[in-house]
């Protein structure tokens, strides 16, 4: 069973087209599983459960639809050609469903391996309802949606350096200052105000302003600065900011600059953040994803963050686990057998700690 937020007033039906689910068949550690995508989705599970393999599927499809050759795309995925197809199998298939104005399209993409190497079967597209449709237009809708996927995995050490003024945020967040500085003046001011608003409750320091400033004669490089309540006239550059502050700044900027109707994927969303700030993080994720009409998929294995989601988010949480054969499986949390009975003895996070999910 799956109840989508896209059919509720939460989303106010503002979307044009959005990814609704991903099916994985013989993909890496998965034999046959489905992940449902909502405006805000959490994918939980322990380390090595297979969460990253789900994200690799999105990245692989994005690479291929952006023109990267099959062999190069495979080698850019974690594990490369040795792990992209489940052990003992010869083919892998990915299916992405995209909903556009009430119509659902499904793109099927399959690769196989033989003695001559890897090959692919031409992607097929079908309309899930019986209706006439323009296949070229439909393929463009689906491929554009996949192309717009952005996977964020901030690396604070790379965010502390000067960065070139840029239009698009990099996966590791290293050019965050350059992206902010590259905006038009009014857009830059608005983003910096929102960034300050969202980040001020989170870090250990009392931040009252955050901004990106260009440097040098040509103004082609930028640095991220913050100002603190106890020393408001002395800026602190990114080199003096904590890992948690930088990671959270990257998350906020990614959400504020993401293309409307696109899917933003954030790996280990709470990594480096103090557990006491989990509630604020969840609040920010809900607010920005709703206001900007983007879908956000977060992975986490932190019981504290999972507890902060609250029971109303249970329908939008999926968990990844391994079976006795080592296969990864995705299951909706709400479909867990005896979930209500299990939760009588503790929260979802507590159940994870006790290895009961």
Each predicted region: which residue ranges?
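Conserved P-loop NTP-binding catalytic core
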Residues: 3, 13, 56-114
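C-terminal lobe/lid and adjacent interdomain/linker elements of RecA-like ASCE P-loop ATPase modules
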Residues: 8-18, 280-357
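N-terminal pre-Walker A segment at the start of P-loop NTPase domains
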Residues: 13-30
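Phosphate-binding P-loop
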Residues: 33-38, 258
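Phosphate-binding glycine-rich loops of NTP-binding sites
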Residues: 38-77, 175, 243, 248-254, ...
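Residue-level preference for the first positions of well-ordered beta-strands
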Residues: 40-42, 261-263, 295
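Electropositive, glycine-dotted interaction segments
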Residues: 93, 99-212
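Conserved ABC ATPase signature
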Residues: 204, 208-256, 263-276
């Amino acid at each position: 069973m799956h109840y989508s937020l896209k059919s509720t007033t939460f989303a106010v039906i503002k979307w044009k087209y959005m990814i609704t689910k991903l099916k994985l068949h013989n993909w890496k550690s998965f034999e046959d599983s489905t992940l449902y995508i909502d405006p805000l989705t959490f994918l939980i599970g322990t380390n090595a459960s297979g969460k990253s393999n789900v994200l690799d599927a999105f990245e692989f499809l994005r690479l291929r639809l952006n023109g990267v050759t099959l062999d190069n795309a495979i080698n850019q995925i974690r594990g490369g050609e040795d792990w992209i197809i489940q052990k003992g199998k010869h083919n892998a298939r990915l299916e992405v469903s995209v909903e556009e104005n009430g119509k659902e399209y499904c793109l099927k993409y399959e690769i196989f391996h033989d003695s001559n190497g890897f090959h692919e079967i031409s992607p097929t597209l079908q309309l899930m309802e019986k209706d006439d449709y323009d296949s070229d237009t439909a393929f463009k809708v689906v491929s554009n949606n996949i192309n717009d996927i952005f996977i964020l995995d901030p690396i604070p050490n790379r965010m502390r350096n000067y960065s070139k003024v840029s239009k698009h945020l990099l996966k590791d967040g290293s050019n965050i200052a350059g992206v902010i500085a590259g905006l038009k003046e009014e857009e830059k001011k608005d983003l910096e105000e929102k960034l300050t608003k969202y980040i001020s409750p989170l870090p250990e320091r009392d931040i009252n302003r955050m901004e990106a400033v260009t440097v040098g004669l040509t103004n082609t490089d930028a640095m991220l600065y913050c100002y603190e309540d106890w020393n408001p006239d002395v800026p602190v550059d990114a080199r003096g900011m904590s890992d948690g502050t930088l990671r959270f700044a990257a998350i906020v900027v990614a959400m504020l600059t993401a293309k409307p109707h696109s899917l933003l994927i954030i790996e280990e969303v709470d990594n480096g953040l103090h557990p006491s700030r989990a509630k604020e993080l969840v609040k920010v994720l809900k607010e920005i994803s709703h206001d900007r009409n983007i879908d956000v998929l977060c992975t986490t294995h932190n019981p504290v963050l999972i507890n902060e989601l609250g029971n109303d988010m249970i329908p939008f949480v999926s968990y990844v686990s391994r079976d006795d054969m080592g296969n990864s499986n995705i299951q909706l949390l709400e479909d867990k057998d005896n979930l209500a009975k299990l939760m009588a003895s503790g929260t979802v996070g507590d159940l994870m700690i006790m290895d009961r999910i």
